[in-house]
Regions:
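A hydrophobic/aromatic-rich effector-binding and dimerization subdomain
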Residues: 1-16, 69, 73-142
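Conserved short histidine dyad/triad with adjacent acidic residue
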Residues: 16-32
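Tight coil/turn sites that cap or link beta-strands
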Residues: 23-24, 58-59, 67, 88
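An amphipathic alpha-helical interaction segment
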Residues: 115-175, 182
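Basic/polar phosphate-binding segments, predominantly the helix-turn-helix DNA-binding elements
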Residues: 165-171, 190-238, 249, 253-285
């Protein structure tokens, strides 16, 4: 089998999201500039993502980010329905649904931290749930095939319905790994919103009703990082983004704007994470 990774492309001129039915899964390792939701409609197989392999079966739903090298390496009567969507379209959807319970966990953090979770926090639909999802997929398929006026709008509308359904199912899951990533995604979302504020471990575990020890352990298991290290990296990434957007900004202003109280500590962490000092970084983007 050829293990060379290829970059797949797709034309989104019809709609911002497209249904692709797959009866013969791609076994070539590949990436792409779009993201996808895969629905296992029938059969079973082995899905490889970034070098790790996971069993998949009927009812499984998983999101794959396009920069993750992936392929199907084994399959038994496997039929997939993939909905692929442009990343800029996802940013629009993210703005709409970020507050929807289960959205960040399913679409952002489960794919991002899948390696740490060993695919234990994926979504597996019940037979009834799968039938509900298949009805929405059929609507998208019909609109794509007939292409009557306004078909692309209906496709994008039904796609949003599908996202809401998936998030509801994910949020109600009894899977313990899923419950863990739902909790931790809420803590990360809180960090994203309040990174400039004073945030303590106590602030975070109280937000999600966990004990300190359980929160620290669960966060580390899922993200591979301690909560504080994660917060520091997030703040540094926000600082770098601020500098790129406004190269005339003063380092001290950036420091305080992203939640640091000591400029020396900020400078040390910035250099450790980004690789150069804040001043040099700003000069690069003048």
């Amino acid at each position: 089998m050829n293990s060379k990774c290829i970059d797949l492309k797709h034309d989104f001129s019809f709609a911002k999201c497209v249904l692709v039915e797959i009866n013969e899964p791609v076994i070539q390792l590949h990436t792409h500039k779009f993201d996808e939701i895969a629905f296992v409609l029938k059969g079973s197989g082995i899905h490889e993502v970034d070098g790790d392999r996971y069993p998949i079966m009927r009812g499984d739903v998983f999101v794959t980010h396009g920069n993750q090298a992936h392929r199907i390496v084994e399959q038994q009567n496997l039929i997939l329905a993939n909905i692929i969507y442009e990343r800029k379209h996802f940013q629009e959807i993210k703005g709409e649904f970020k507050e929807l319970p289960g959205f960040s966990a399913l679409f952002v953090y489960e794919p991002l931290f899948r390696k740490n979770q060993q695919f234990k926090a994926f979504l597996r639909l019940s037979s009834r749930q799968l039938e509900n999802i298949k009805m929405l997929i059929s609507q998208i398929k019909e609109e794509q095939e007939k292409r009557h006026s306004g078909a692309e709008k209906i496709v994008e509308y039904v796609f949003r319905q599908l996202i809401v359904k998936l998030c509801r199912y994910y949020h109600k899951s009894d899977n313990q790994s899923t419950k863990g990533i739902l909790k931790i995604s809420s803590a990360i979302d809180y960090m994203e919103k309040h990174f400039a504020d004073k945030i303590t471990i106590e602030t975070l575990y109280n937000q999600i009703n966990m004990s300190s020890a359980t929160f620290r352990r669960t966060f580390k298991n899922i993200t591979g990082s301690s909560p504080i290290d994660f917060l520091i990296r997030l703040r540094i990434e926000k600082a770098a983004e601020m500098m790129r957007k406004k190269p005339s900004i003063r380092v001290l202003e950036v420091c305080y704007s992203v939640g640091f109280e000591n400029s020396g500590y900020f400078g040390n962490k910035f250099k450790k994470i980004i690789g150069i000092t804040p001043k040099k970084y700003i000069k690069q983007h003048l």
